[in-house]
Amino acid sequence: DAELLETLMEEQGYFASERIDYELMNLDDAPRAEIQGASPAGLTLRSHMQEDEEYLFALQSAYEQEEVLPGNASFNAAACRLNLRQILAREQILVAELDGQVVGKINTSAESFTRYQIGGVYVRPDCRGLGIGAKMTAVFSQNLLAQGRGLTLFVKKRNTAACRVYRKAGFSVLADYRITYY
């Protein structure tokens, strides 16, 4: 249990600088119909194209700074670009365009014999609340499930909007997970 380990660490003089709680979620059946509802006019979901790299880099940069890096870490643009190129080369990715502008992305971040892990879900802040994240999640999940594997993802508990989207899609919580930074 994370709290027990943290207590033992504190007794040894090590104090956490940050604790981030996650939910480990799974989906093994088609996304629920209600999440596949209306999407904003002008929304297109598509595979990535080579000319998307700069737009996707902007999204990946924002995603890493907002969702990945702990509070005391500094952003490394070169590492982010390398990470994005690896995603584009190795993972499945879906791009969201709104009125011709790239505004969101969702990708796999790992795979096993039986599961895909979803990660890198990000919608530009000025486009949130329009149903883009929900639509990306529904379409991407449906495409991955059609390949015969279940889905897994980690979501920060404090990201209540994302938690709500995933639950609405049919993802269920398998376990709690914590990362503690010292």
Task: Name these PLM-found stretches.
Residues 1-40, 180:
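Acyl-donor-binding surface of acyltransferase catalytic domains
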Residues 8-10, 166, 171:
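Conserved active-site tyrosine of GNAT-family acetyltransferases
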Residues 44-56:
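A short beta-loop-alpha structural element at the N-terminal edge
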Residues 64-82:
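Conserved GNAT-fold acetyl-CoA-binding loop/helix
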Residues 81, 90-106:
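Conserved beta-hairpin
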